[in-house]
Regions:
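DNA-recognition helix of helix-turn-helix
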Residues: 103-123
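N-terminal positioning helix adjacent to the helix-turn-helix/winged-helix DNA-binding module
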Residues: 66-69, 73, 77-81, 112
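N-terminal interaction/assembly modules
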Residues: 1-73, 97, 126-130
Length: 130
């Protein structure tokens, strides 16, 4: 059985990685729009953009698989615990942002995180403690 914490962390790290790659691609698109005076530079930028988009597509495929696996575990949870675990591991939100979005204190968020992860570990097992 897969290590539930590792599965959740993998989904989160891929989400963060893809957000960074997409931001880089958006910057390159803005640069390519301004690079009209030099056709060689524009060609080079477009080629780099195409390569990065292919890499992002591959990463997105991996992320979808990782999120699907993580969601099979998370689906066991309900209510506030699920909202906190899903927000952090699937949507890659910070704890502060989750607290604001869910209208809760950070302390409450951390309590829900702990109880949710404890339930997942009891249900699915884990080699290491939180």
């Amino acid at each position: 059985m897969a290590d539930v914490i590792a599965v959740l962390e993998r989904a989160r790290s891929l989400e963060l990685e893809i957000k960074t790659q997409i931001e880089h691609i958006e910057q390159l698109r803005r640069i390519s729009k301004r690079a009209v005076e030099s056709s060689a530079y524009a060609r080079e930028t477009v080629a780099k953009l195409a390569r990065l988009e292919r890499e992002v597509n591959t990463s997105i495929d991996l992320m979808c698989d990782a999120k699907a696996e993580a969601l099979t575990y998370i689906s066991f949870l309900t209510g506030e615990e699920r909202a906190v675990i899903e927000g952090y591991f699937i949507l890659a939100k910070s704890w502060q942002r989750l607290a604001n979005d869910l209208y809760m204190s950070e302390r409450r968020i951390f309590m829900l995180r702990k109880s949710g992860l404890d339930k997942l570990i009891r249900r699915y097992g884990d080699k290491e403690a939180i």
